[in-house]
UniProtKB/Swiss-Prot annotation:
It comes from the Eukaryota. This is Trehalase inhibitor. Under resting conditions, inhibits trehalase in a dose-dependent manner.
Length: 19
């Protein structure tokens, strides 16, 4: 997805999945 300051559970920079 789009990289954002948010971090997904696995650590992947993905604000679209963790916003």
């Amino acid at each position: 997805a789009i990289p954002t300051p948010h971090v997904y559970k696995v650590x992947v920079p993905d604000g679209a999945l963790n916003d």
